[in-house]
């Protein structure tokens, strides 16, 4: 096999994979078509664009996403390093200035030795080179057709949604207030409180608001993590108060009481000029978003610098198709990484990009496969998406898929800390000599 690797897609997984291979002295051709042909969800030409949210999840080791990020730091992840540098206040979460993050990743990759960037759509698979498909949740129709031909699988897809962003100066802070749930962090979230009447007025307008038309809408499959707010509302009149609008853990400083419902906004840029409406991914038409979301107390005169959008997300049946290195079982030179594998979320995408790159590098250097067991969070997610099962649904980082402890610990926080400690020790031992 020629010691040159083709990486398709400069999203989170592809960017990480390309960098890790290049750093190990392997030549990489990185295909990214955005400069000439954007997907429905992308707006910038930068690599590793964060589409849905600017948060990479909790940084706490009592959280599986926090553990996965720590594992990536141990492995030397470029993207987590850049995320740490571009952090914005968000309590225990690792949220980033999304433009600053993507700009820095792009600059590094364009200036890294051994990486050649090709701004074209990739559609033809060579037989003499390793190809890593990291084309993401918005894989082009032509490429996905080629993948379908190679794998023999029909296209599987669902729809993701992205939340609106408003300017801080347009938020009425006489009505809204800063506070983090349960007092964690430094009160970085903006909270827009609703009384019962305001909530039901908002609810009634939301469920009847006009939505954008989608192709094959009847076939949609949605993740709870990116479920459109109108879909949540339509599942029950109080459902939002147990989800994105839950008031628990928040005390309104103006009334010193808990409100009936609360809409939270999270800082989206380093300067604190922009805030995204947490959990408000949506498929409403832009005019309807302005009308309905302006009913939220504090957002009556909000300036929307980006409206929410909805877009298709594709993934393959990884449990049937991929081995433990994320290589196709029936095609020796093709690997997959990122959300197209069914690994859900930003951090999982980075992790699979790192994992595939390490395995491809080892293969080209005639070393043993780098297989992580489900003791680590990265190993657990790889195990989940490659272990054959009757019904495969995408999965993100969580402690439910990691191997249980030998001891039974009732306290969840203590148990999660123990799982994280064991995972970190295991990973450090696993990379000795790698």
Swiss-Prot record:
Cofactor annotation: FAD
Q: Please tell me one Gene Ontology term that the record gives under cellular component.
A: cytosol
Spell out the SUPFAM superfamilies in the cross-references: FAD/NAD(P)-binding domain (SSF51905)
Give the keywords, sorted: Cytoplasm, FAD, Flavoprotein, Methyltransferase, NAD, NADP, Transferase, tRNA processing
Catalytic function, reaction form: uridine(54) in tRNA + (6R)-5,10-methylene-5,6,7,8-tetrahydrofolate + NADH + H(+) = 5-methyluridine(54) in tRNA + (6S)-5,6,7,8-tetrahydrofolate + NAD(+); uridine(54) in tRNA + (6R)-5,10-methylene-5,6,7,8-tetrahydrofolate + NADPH + H(+) = 5-methyluridine(54) in tRNA + (6S)-5,6,7,8-tetrahydrofolate + NADP(+)
**Pfam families for the chain:** GIDA
Q: Where does FAD bind?
A: 9-14
The record's EC number reads: 2.1.1.74
Top-rank taxon of the source lineage equals: Bacteria
Indicate where this protein resides in the cell. Cytoplasm
One GO BP annotation is: tRNA methylation
What does the record give under GO molecular function?
Answer: flavin adenine dinucleotide binding; tRNA (uracil(54)-C5)-methyltransferase activity, 5,10-methylenetetrahydrofolate-dependent
Presence of the UniProt keyword Flavoprotein in the record = yes
Stated role: Catalyzes the folate-dependent formation of 5-methyl-uridine at position 54 (M-5-U54) in all tRNAs.
Among PANTHER family, the record links this protein to: GLUCOSE INHIBITED DIVISION PROTEIN A, METHYLENETETRAHYDROFOLATE--TRNA-(URACIL-5-)-METHYLTRANSFERASE TRMFO
Family, per the entry? Belongs to the MnmG family. TrmFO subfamily.
User: Protein name, please?
Assistant: Methylenetetrahydrofolate--tRNA-(uracil-5-)-methyltransferase TrmFO
Gene designation:
trmFO
């Amino acid at each position: 096999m020629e010691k040159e690797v083709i990486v398709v897609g400069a999203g989170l997984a592809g960017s990480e994979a390309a960098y890790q291979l290049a750093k190990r002295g392997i030549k990489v051709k990185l295909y990214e078509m955005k400069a000439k042909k954007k997907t429905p969800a992308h707006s910038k030409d930068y690599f590793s664009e964060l589409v849905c949210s600017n948060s990479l999840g909790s940084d706490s080791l009592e959280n599986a996403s926090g553990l996965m990020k720590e594992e990536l730091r141990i492995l030397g992840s470029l993207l987590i390093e850049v995320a740490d540098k571009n952090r914005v206040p968000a309590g225990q979460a690792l949220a980033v200035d999304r433009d600053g993050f993507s700009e820095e990743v792009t600059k590094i990759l364009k200036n890294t030795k051994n990486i050649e960037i090709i701004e074209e759509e990739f559609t033809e698979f060579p037989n003499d080179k390793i190809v890593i498909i990291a084309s993401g949740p918005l894989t082009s129709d032509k490429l996905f057709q080629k993948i379908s031909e190679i794998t023999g699988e029909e296209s599987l897809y669902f729809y993701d949604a992205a939340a609106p962003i408003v300017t801080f100066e347009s938020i009425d802070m006489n009505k809204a207030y800063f506070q983090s749930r349960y007092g964690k962090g430094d009160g970085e979230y903006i909270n827009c409180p609703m009384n019962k009447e305001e909530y039901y007025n908002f609810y009634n307008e939301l469920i009847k608001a006009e939505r954008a038309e989608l192709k094959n809408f009847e076939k949609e499959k949605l993740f709870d993590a990116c479920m459109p707010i109108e879909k949540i509302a339509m599942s029950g009149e109080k459902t939002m108060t147990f989800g994105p609008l839950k008031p628990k853990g928040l005390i309104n400083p103006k009334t010193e009481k808990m409100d009936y419902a609360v809409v939270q906004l999270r800082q989206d840029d380093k300067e604190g000029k922009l805030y995204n409406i947490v959990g408000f991914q949506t498929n409403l038409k832009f005019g309807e978003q302005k009308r309905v979301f302006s009913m939220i107390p504090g957002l009556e005169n909000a300036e929307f610098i980006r409206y929410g959008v909805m877009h298709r997300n594709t993934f393959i049946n990884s449990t049937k198709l991929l081995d433990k290195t994320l290589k196709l079982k029936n095609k020796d030179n093709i690997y997959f990484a990122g959300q197209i594998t069914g690994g859900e979320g930003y951090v999982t995408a980075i992790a699979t990009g790192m994992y595939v790159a390490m395995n491809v590098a080892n293969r080209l250097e005639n070393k043993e496969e780098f297989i992580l067991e489900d003791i680590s969070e990265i190993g657990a997610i790889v195990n989940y998406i490659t272990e054959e099962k009757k019904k495969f649904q995408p999965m993100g980082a969580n402690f439910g898929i990691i191997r249980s402890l030998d001891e039974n610990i009732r306290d969840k926080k203590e148990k999660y800390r123990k799982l994280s400690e064991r995972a970190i020790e295991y990973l450090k031992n696993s990379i000795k000599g790698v």
